[in-house]
Amino acid sequence: MSVNLTINGMQVSAPEESTILEAAEAAGVIIPTLCHHPDLTDVGACRMCVVSVEGARGLQTACTTPAVEGMVVETESTEAREARTFVLEMLLTDHPNDCMTCEADGDCELQRWVYEYDVAFPDHQGIRHDTPIGADPSPVILVDMNKCILCGLCVRACSEVQVHDIWNFSQRGFTTIVVAGANQTLQEAGCLSCGTCVAYCPVGALFDRPSQGWGRAIHQKKVRTTCNYCDVGCQFDLNVNIHTGKITRVTATPEAPVNGMALCVKGRYGNDFIHSEERLTTPLIRDESVVEGRFPGFREATWDEAVALVAESLVHWRDTCGPESVGYFSSAKCTNEENYLMQKISRAVSKTNNVDHCARLCHASTVAGLATALGSGAMTNSIADATEEAKLYFVAGSNTTEQHPVIGRKMLKMIREKGTKLIVADPRRIELCDAAVLHLQQRPGTDVALFNGIMYEILANGWEDRAYIDARTENFDVFREMVMMFPPERAAEITGVPADKIREAARLLAENKPAAVFWAMGITQHTTGTMNVMTLANLQMLLGNIGVPGGGVNPLRGQNNVQGACDVGALSNVYPGYQRVTDPTHKAKFEEAWGVEGLSDKVGLTIVEMINAAHTGDLKALYVMAENPMTSDPDLNHVREALERLDFLVVQDIFMTETAKFADVILPGACFAEKDGTFTNTERRIQRIRKAVDPPGVARPDWEILCDVATAMGYPMAYPSPAAIQDEIAAVTPIYGGVRYWRLDAGESLQWPVTDDAHPGTPILHVGTFTRGKGLFTANDHVEPQECPTVEYPFTMTTGRVLYHWHGGAQTRRSQPLMALSPEPLVELHPDDASRLGIAEGDKIRVTSRRGDFIARAWLTDRVALGLIFGTFHFPEGNVNWATGAFLDPQAKIPEYKVSA
């Protein structure tokens, strides 16, 4: 339905329930505002949008007045302009006259409208606010409340976008101010330092502190790109000073398809690593005679020399000891195009499938489990659909607000605004638990028993979707027989979750359809990870929640391009597009496409298996691109010994990482801001990254380096651009068949499968039919973790990340704002356990397993249960992976990071 009205003599049609402001904007009529943003609730606070409405008494605020049929509006009446001028004059009586030095100069809405309405600073000056500038110690948000115009945008943004409610109004009348918490510092009030308030502030009252003094808005160019931290796929603009060539700040954009104006602290403030003085700037070759300089033990080399040595060594070991003696670590930090080239070199040049990347360490069990059950190992629904259309979220093993913050905050927003229900299954009491109707705090490693117990209750009450099961699935009877072995009482005995909570979870899932299931590494990083994933697929098929809006099985992937790296074949068992290396048809297809013979049909070694092979001497040479196994792999003492035993190691990275220190050759790559390419996010959305600045020194984009190495190995690679590589990917990868740069650059937002150039993409998988035909119910039994507590090792250790750091910390430890917010490693320990051991808050403690130990400060918290400790791998000295074990899921070969004794 629509309404018809007249604005400035022009006939306008607008959707029903539009405001005058929305109707005017849709018709191209600009009405001034200072407190309006389309993302937020309108409050009519600034009075700048007042308009004349025929028949109405007085001026009306366009942002809050509904557009109605037959309304006649004049936006530029004398009365309206005079009122706006008066508002601006009053604001200037209590506003600093410091535009010449203000950080917001050129990007200030007040300045814009003062200029537009030709308003001068008044000769008279009334009482003015006088608050200390920058007194709040936040390392990321510069607060100057002398410039605040009380628009309330920061208050509403924090509440409505972040659902965090840090900013609020205090006092009344002229003394009204905006404060954090109960007039506290931002950190005291619990601020997450996301900077959303800064993004919405129309003046200079809130500003990005790290950007202070880096250049005015007029001196910046904006380059649209995609974040290189997690796989949510947030897009933003890198602001580059046109004079210095340096990135000055990150600004959100409402056009971003996934995140809009929302960003997390890492995305907004964690990119100063780009210009770190620790960046690698030139190729390096090991030379123990070098004892001084930036990198003792290495000498600088030319690109020709370094590439020649790499190529010569890789060819030597291939020809001397066979293709299986060479391995390649590709990277989820790199682009689709670069991962494609890396696996192509491994297969077409070295003739081995020994190529893998960090998906093996985080979501390999997701790929294996979903491929078995559904035929496709990826998130089924789009982020917007799963968060906005679901009636219930079942979040298992995902600390969403810390690890995928934009999705986590979106969940909290829907819970508050729409009443979406939330069930959390997690051994820790994470932030989401505060908004949940039910927290299932299972013992680590008992997920299958928990989910089977829930499904027992669903079946016992006849709550399953029989029509869906009969029409779309198979193997139900075998599955049912297994599930009926897990009544809630038995599941409770195994998991530690009370039986009544298991029953309540089943009831909530049955009564609130569609429900969306989300999980992350709390589900996947187990020796039973693949079974965990298949059991969640069972649950959603049982309820008929797959292939429908608001439902689905939705793994939240880790690294920025872990989905894409899998898609383009950086896995040991599949070519691009998940075409199996053991299938003769696929082998022949890629031999023809790549112009080679003799591609291997033997499944290659995974990351952990390659490390093991290096340890035994079977793997001679290893090429590592933007991976850091000396921080991210389990059992780091074993990894260190393996790297030391390699005959040749080449590391291609942007920093001298812990792994690079073992290398024979180091090749300096370009980071995401220094090259073009594409990333694919967790919802299968392919998005562009774009070059904003030059790499430091003679560092080069990874795709260019790989082309040179392949050519030097005797297999010429010459692509004019990443777009040309993407065209080749499209030619051999059916799910990417219609992915083209010209489509992405035209603004198309494509989710695979995209089968041809006219295909619009696929927001929801398995609609009507599953990729494999019928969904496969699997029978999954409870299996205990490989390690359980003993008298000698009485604690269970689980692992993860914190909000302010990312994985091994190579980037975040080189970000000043992030290090200021989280400067050292912490271990979560229950207060009662700490009391028994005589440990106080903040004590440095040593955590020891059968394999090794690490040191971190104790954080005493009931977020963890008795007998459970939680640590991270962001800091070398406090890295839990000195203590974790390399016990592998037999199907996906993923290590069991989540349970160590």
Which positions does each model-derived feature cover?
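N-terminal cofactor/phosphate-binding cores enriched in small/glycine residues
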Residues: 12-69
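Hydrophobic alpha/beta core scaffold segments
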Residues: 347, 602, 607, 611-619, ...
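N-terminal export/assembly segments and adjacent metallocofactor-ligating motifs
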Residues: 2-13, 17, 25, 53-55, ...
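A glycine-rich, hydrophobic/aromatic-adjacent loop/helix-cap motif
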Residues: 510-615, 758, 768-772
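Flexible glycine/proline-rich, aromatic-decorated loop/lid segments
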Residues: 53-56, 428-431, 654-690
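Short beta-alpha connecting loops at secondary-structure transitions
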Residues: 6, 69-75, 183, 434-442, ...
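Long, low-complexity segments enriched in small/aliphatic residues
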Residues: 556, 565-571, 722-817
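Long, contiguous, secondary-structure-rich segments that constitute the structural scaffold
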Residues: 695-698, 702-752, 814-828, 832-901
